[in-house]
């Protein structure tokens, strides 16, 4: 498994990268990535029913559709995203515990009472800090999730507010939960970069075939 700590913060590039790795390679991957301020919507969502269009337009926040289902999520540099791409393991499809276990175990080792909820979310004391989604094809599974570490909650709540004048929609709508940042629950304060390093170490230590990998110009 190749472990990538992706440094590019372009949301369109990062989403295209994980889709490319999933659809056009035959390797296993774990990737950490962060995006500049953006909204990422599920493949089946009516975008207008999920975002505060006026706020998003005025603040020039890009809205990008991903290849997995689930709700709309707000990204900024205080939000850390993780992606697993696993080949030939269709039995792990919908097994969110399997893919989120490293995050939960790492946080618990740091004294944070993280747990998986029944709705594919990770919670701390009943508050959501991570949403997860998956897709699969004949070759394997892509699982990705968000980790609110030190995100701008003000922008998050404004960007995802629904306009009360909108028409009723039959499209899938997000189930909103109370949210929290991981950083608020750490006994010892660390940066998002330090947390990223800890999570990468956790992945490498837990997988015998895992090795760090940096994307080359040829890859890009």
Write out the residue ranges for each language-model feature.
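Catalytic beta-strand/loop module used to bind and position nucleotide/cofactor moieties
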Residues: 77, 81-191, 199
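Short helix/loop capping segments that flank catalytic or ligand/cofactor-binding pockets
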Residues: 41-42, 49-51, 151-152, 156-158
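Active-site loop/lid in soluble adenylation, ligation, and acyl-transfer enzymes
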Residues: 1-50, 134, 178-187, 191-195, ...
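A glycine-rich, hydrophobic loop/mini-helix early in the fold
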Residues: 58-82
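Short, hydrophobic/aliphatic alpha-helical segments
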Residues: 51-65, 127, 132
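Short glycine- and Lys/Arg-enriched binding-loop motifs that mark or flank ligand-binding interfaces
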Residues: 38, 65-67, 74, 122, ...
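Membrane helical hairpin/interfacial module
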Residues: 35-38, 44, 71, 77, ...
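Short beta-strand
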Residues: 30-34, 73, 114-116
């Amino acid at each position: 498994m190749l472990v990538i700590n992706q440094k590019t913060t372009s949301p369109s590039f990062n989403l295209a990268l994980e889709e490319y790795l999933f659809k056009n390679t035959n390797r296993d991957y774990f990737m950490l990535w962060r995006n500049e301020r953006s909204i990422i919507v599920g493949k089946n969502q009516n975008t207008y029913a999920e975002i505060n269009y006026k706020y998003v337009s005025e603040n020039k926040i890009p809205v990008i559709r991903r290849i997995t289902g689930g709700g709309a999520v707000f990204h900024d540099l205080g939000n850390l995203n993780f992606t697993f791409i696993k080949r030939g393991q269709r039995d792990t499809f919908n097994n969110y515990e399997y893919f989120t276990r490293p995050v939960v175990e790492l946080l618990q080792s740091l004294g944070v009472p993280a747990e998986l909820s029944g709705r594919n979310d990770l919670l701390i004391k009943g508050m959501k800090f991570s949403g997860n989604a998956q897709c699969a094809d004949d070759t394997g599974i892509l699982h990705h999730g968000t980790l609110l570490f030190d995100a701008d909650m003000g922008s998050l709540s404004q960007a995802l507010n629904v306009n009360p004048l909108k028409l009723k929609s039959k499209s899938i709508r997000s189930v909103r939960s109370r949210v929290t940042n991981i950083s608020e629950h750490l006994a010892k304060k660390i940066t998002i970069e330090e947390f990223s390093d800890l999570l990468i170490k956790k992945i490498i230590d837990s997988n015998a075939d895992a090795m760090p990998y940096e994307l080359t110009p040829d890859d890009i």
